[in-house]
Amino acid sequence: MAQTLLNDTFLRALLREPTDYTPIWLMRQAGRYLPEYNATRARAGSFLGLAKQPDYATEVTLQPLERFPLDAAILFSDILTIPDAMGLGLDFAAGEGPKFAHPVRTEADVAKLAVPDIGATLGYVTDAVREIRRALTDGEGRQRVPLIGFSGSPWTLACYMVEGGGSDDFRTVKSMAYARPDLMHRILDVNAQAVAAYLNAQIEAGAQAVMIFDTWGGALADGGYQRFSLDYVRRVLAQLKREHDGARVPAIAFTKGGGLWLEELAATGVDAVGLDWTVNLGRARERVAGRVALQGNLDPTILFAPPEAIRAEARAVLDSYGNHPGHVFNLGHGISQFTPPEHVAELVDEVHRHSRAIRSGAGS
């Protein structure tokens, strides 16, 4: 049975086509701010139990869509699945974030790195993509909203692989980048091949758009960013399947703290660039001059404000972009676990309401 996408607003916005309103989805929209997510995670036993079991991953992917009229679903997974599949021993200690049992710090460590067999080691992710697509589709083949697949960027994965977990200053990985750039580039080359293979597997399984999260690209200096992050994002994009089942598969790239390099990121071959909250959206639109769509960029902490303040800030973001195609509303980073769900409802409603008013010429 042929599938029909009931709401393709998100995909059309990524391709800079006119839309009746501005689509919205949120980074970490399936997460700890939702009581139902916490209940499912408790049943799964752990975060990795949640991410590695397709039925649980499907359940939590759909939870925010049951609460809010969001315009896209995003696969529930983690950016560190690739280094875990490389055998680095990923674990999430309570209250400590991700840790790797076998960080990559020596020549011998780097020599052991290889692109994982995606089907053999990450089949649970592609199984989840297929299961989520089925769950989004009714008995008559009508799919509610598109599904986004994703990966961490080669540099961001390397940050965790070399540090062995999160870091306040990334001194271990940055020291390697400048003291032993040969080792750093070998890690990044393997990572770029792995990210491209991983995203292509998600596309073949049914992801209708993909996003590269370069969470720590902004930790690099100008010059270092181009060598160690941007160049490898470009390599990933060059290897991506951009069409599947006769449809364009848009790609989004997001560098947190990367506003300085917006024009360079827009020139990598992406369809859309994600922006954090430090960037003026209207000026960003002028800077990219219609070459790419833009995604963002409300400060996530605004969701702790009273509802009318949330609505006012949402309007400010929309007004900044103006009545132009190519905007996907999102936060400038992931939603906080402490966010009241009812505040998310206010945001989604205002984005849809006010963007329709802008399109109609009614303003506020």
Swiss-Prot record:
The keyword Lyase applies. One of its GO terms (cellular component) is cytosol. Pathway: Porphyrin-containing compound metabolism; protoporphyrin-IX biosynthesis; coproporphyrinogen-III from 5-aminolevulinate: step 4/4. It is an enzyme of class 4 (lyase). It catalyses: uroporphyrinogen III + 4 H(+) = coproporphyrinogen III + 4 CO2. Pfam families: URO-D. The record marks D78 as: Transition state stabilizer. Its EC number is 4.1.1.37. Belongs to the uroporphyrinogen decarboxylase family. This is Uroporphyrinogen decarboxylase. The gene is hemE.
